[in-house]
């Protein structure tokens, strides 16, 4: 029997949705183009390592070959279980041998059998047509900050969107030029049980605003 639109509206008025689900009977979906993703089992807790929570370390790279040796020296010493860590890199607008050096360092790390090798590694290449002087003064000058930050944001968005998987509980953004960091930094960060943690300091006071300056917080 066909219902008029008014009759159907009255029939389903007690429902929040016009679709009736029987939660006790599984619905078999045959189409291979439909992929369900259940994020409910994925948790982020203060006992991340004990609960075997996966961590994704993301690092954008641009003309970074000279930093990679130190980068891997530090990340190889991380005490968080490496079998729970995935690495992902985005290489953009690079003019040096960053890709070759990265590949060599990863090959060396991933061949190790002493627990240093990571669960997986992804290398993403995406150019944005952004060119910036490698001179420190130019890179950190006020005029360069808006286009530089815009390019950095685009690179990070591409990297996150490409590398993040449903099984990841945590994302750790790590710059390539860090020269020192605690070996337990992942455990320290997850122990705070916060959605987002950022540093609250500025070691480069700005002097461009009519004599005003931003001091360290």
Locate the predicted segments by residue.
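Short, acidic, metal-binding catalytic loop of nucleotide-sugar glycosyltransferases
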Residues: 50, 73-84, 94, 104-112
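Active-site-proximal specificity loops/subdomain of glycosyltransferases
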Residues: 97-168
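N-proximal low-complexity "stem/linker" segments adjacent to membrane-targeting elements
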Residues: 1-77
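Catalytic phosphate/metal-binding cores of nucleic-acid and nucleotide-processing enzymes, i.e., regions
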Residues: 69-71, 105-106, 153-161, 178-179, ...
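Short loop->beta transition adjacent to catalytic acidic/histidine clusters or analogous donor-positioning motifs
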Residues: 54-55, 78-89, 96, 114, ...
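Mobile, glycine-rich extracellular loop/lid and propeptide segments
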Residues: 59-64, 105, 171-172, 186-187
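The conserved acidic donor/metal-binding loop of glycosyltransferases
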Residues: 170-179
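Conserved catalytic core of nucleotide-sugar-dependent glycosyltransferases
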Residues: 160, 178-217
């Amino acid at each position: 029997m066909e219902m008029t639109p008014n009759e159907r509206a009255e029939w389903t008025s007690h429902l929040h949705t016009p679709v009736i689900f029987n939660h006790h009977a599984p619905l078999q979906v045959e189409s291979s183009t439909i992929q369900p993703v259940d994020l409910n089992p994925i948790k982020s807790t203060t006992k991340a390592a004990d609960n075997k929570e996966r961590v994704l370390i993301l690092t954008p790279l641009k003309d970074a070959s000279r930093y990679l040796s130190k980068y891997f020296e530090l990340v190889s010493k991380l005490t968080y279980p490496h079998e729970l860590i995935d690495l992902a890199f985005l290489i953009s607008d690079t003019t040096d041998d960053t890709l070759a050096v990265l590949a060599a360092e990863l090959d060396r790390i991933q061949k190790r059998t002493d627990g240093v090798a990571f669960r997986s590694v992804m290398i993403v290449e995406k150019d944005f047509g952004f060119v910036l002087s490698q001179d420190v003064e130019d890179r950190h000058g006020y005029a360069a900050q808006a286009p530089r930050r815009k390019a950095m944001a685009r690179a990070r968005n591409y990297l996150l969107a490409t590398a993040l998987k449903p099984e990841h509980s945590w994302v750790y953004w790590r710059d390539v030029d860090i020269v020192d960091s605690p070996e337990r930094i992942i455990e320290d960060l997850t122990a705070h049980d916060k959605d987002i943690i950022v540093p609250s300091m500025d070691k480069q006071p700005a002097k461009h605003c009519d004599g005003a300056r931003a001091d360290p917080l």
